[in-house]
């Protein structure tokens, strides 16, 4: 490994120190549900499958200076595998996003499942979007990709 080395008296001696970083003040907000986080790893003693489960709840927050803009977000993620059979690996994720202001609300739920066989990676995904509790958009994907050395 050959790395460049600067000689003494190089241009760095003439450089000025960086100034303090600038940034906007945090937004004023009202928290109506605190955020939460859970993370666990389990082993099914009968099947031997190892599962990692992560739950992220970003809470419920209303931004005071933005006309009551309210935001909620949760992510529920599972990753599992059998140590002796990596082809049984599975990723299962559900994300929920919700936004509202006054008498308007919109939310989305996405669910993605990734599995594999000896020859391909399979992806199943679903999306549901609601406006004021009415479903306004749905879509489903069913895809398969060659493993290509994976």
Language-model region placement:
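Glycine/threonine-rich phosphate-binding loop and adjacent beta-strand/alpha-helix elements that clamp
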Residues: 1-150
């Amino acid at each position: 490994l050959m790395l460049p080395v600067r000689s003494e008296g190089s241009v760095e001696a003439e450089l000025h120190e960086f100034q303090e970083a600038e940034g906007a003040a945090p937004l004023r907000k009202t928290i109506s549900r605190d955020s939460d986080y859970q993370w666990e790893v389990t082993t099914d003693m009968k099947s031997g499958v190892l599962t990692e489960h992560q739950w992220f709840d970003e809470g419920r927050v209303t931004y005071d200076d933005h006309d009551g803009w309210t935001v909620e977000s949760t992510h529920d993620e599972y990753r599992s595998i059998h140590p002796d059979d990596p082809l049984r690996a599975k990723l299962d994720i559900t994300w929920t996003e919700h936004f509202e202001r006054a008498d308007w609300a919109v939310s989305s739920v996405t669910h993605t499942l990734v599995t594999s066989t000896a020859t391909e990676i399979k992806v199943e995904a679903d999306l549901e979007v609601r406006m004021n509790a009415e479903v306004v958009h749905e879509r489903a994907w069913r895809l398969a990709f060659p493993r290509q050395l994976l």
